[in-house]
């Protein structure tokens, strides 16, 4: 991996990319609409057959800045997904099913919609000309509705409100699944909902009293978005969730 400079040249990494950099999006990987879109990278991902292939192609494209120098929301979570595959010896799909979904009883969460679940998929609406109208069939918009062997770390899962509630409850319960199985250590949870950016530039939402933990936004102060310590994130088609660990509350919408 090399680093893009202001004059269009590239230089070597000044320091290694860490897992913390990947979780807090300070590794330097841009999003699909940034440098990788310009280099035709998005087109490559739609034809990819494995996460390993995507990450190898990603490594050929210069990153935006030196690791740790700036917050740049991008493909870091996809890289984390590949790291899980390399460390576990399993695909990301296999790992999540065994280590997370089964212990939590998340039976309707998967990377690809089955024929049965495709019929259950929530219809989408769009707001145009002052009114709502039905969007085109949802499955036509979603690449993960098709049976392709591609599992990305940061996108692609389909789920239900009930399944995602199980995930949120696990985080409130100190990382424990029903039956007492410890999925995440309490120390890990504290890192997740603690601001990891500090004075690192690039995170525009800091002006609203928000920070960024390990993979989620976090509220550093009580504000219009919620209480201090609340963390959460959004998903496809304006879905969202937040968790308040201190008051043991969560919301999914």
PLM features: residue spans?
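Hydrophobic-ligand binding "helix-grip"
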Residues: 232
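Short, well-ordered beta-strand micro-motif
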Residues: 217-218, 242-244
């Amino acid at each position: 991996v090399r680093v893009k400079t202001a004059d269009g040249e590239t230089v070597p990494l000044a320091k290694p990319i860490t897992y913390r950099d990947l979780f807090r999006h300070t590794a330097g990987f841009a999003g699909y609409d940034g440098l990788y879109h310009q280099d035709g990278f998005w087109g490559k991902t739609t034809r990819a057959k494995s996460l390993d292939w995507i990450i190898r192609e990603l490594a050929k494209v210069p990153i935006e800045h030196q690791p740790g120098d700036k917050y740049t929301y991008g493909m870091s979570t996809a890289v984390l997904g590949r790291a899980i595959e390399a460390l576990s010896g399993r695909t990301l799909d296999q790992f999540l099913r065994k280590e997370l979904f089964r212990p939590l009883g998340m039976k309707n969460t998967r990377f690809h919609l089955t024929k049965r679940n495709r019929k259950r998929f929530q219809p989408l609406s769009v707001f145009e000309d002052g009114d709502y109208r039905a969007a085109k069939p949802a499955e036509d918009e979603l690449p993960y509705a098709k049976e392709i062997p591609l599992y990305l770390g940061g996108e692609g899962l389909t789920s239900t409100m009930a399944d995602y509630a199980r995930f949120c409850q696990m985080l409130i319960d100190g990382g424990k699944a029903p039956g007492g199985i410890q999925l995440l250590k309490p120390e890990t949870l504290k890192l997740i909902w603690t601001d990891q950016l500090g004075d690192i530039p690039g995170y525009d939402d800091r002006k609203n009293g928000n920070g960024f933990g390990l993979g989620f936004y976090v509220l550093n102060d009580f504000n219009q978005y919620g209480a201090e310590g609340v963390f959460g994130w959004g998903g496809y088609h304006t879905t969202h969730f937040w968790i308040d660990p201190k008051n043991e509350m969560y919301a999914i919408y």
